[in-house]
From Swiss-Prot:
GO terms for molecular function: structural constituent of cuticle. Pfam families: Cuticle_1 (PF08140). Calcified shell. This is Cuticle protein CP1158.
Amino acid sequence: QVGYSGIVSPDGNNIQFTHDFAHSIVLKGPSGIVTSDGKNLQLTAGQASLQAAAPAPPLPVSHYVASQQSVVGPSGIVSPSGNVQFSHEFADNVVLVGPSGIVTKDGNNLQLRA
């Protein structure tokens, strides 16, 4: 992991930055560190892979759909006309719940009824 005071390498070794280097850091990017004095640091492939790890996708949030008087949540839909329980596979495939539908990772989106 790359931080503002040093690097924990994939092999577990710690690299401590000097006080001057740490205070000159302007930006940490996926492949290196940019400093105000031009003494930039290029990360090794192993160090860069720690920075490039994909963040966990956001969890779907319960969403109130006013036109339907329904609540769409991460595990299903509760509506006056009946409830729909999502399968584990479908729930894991959800990217975004919006007022008119659900966007999925595989492109098989679900249109909500008006």
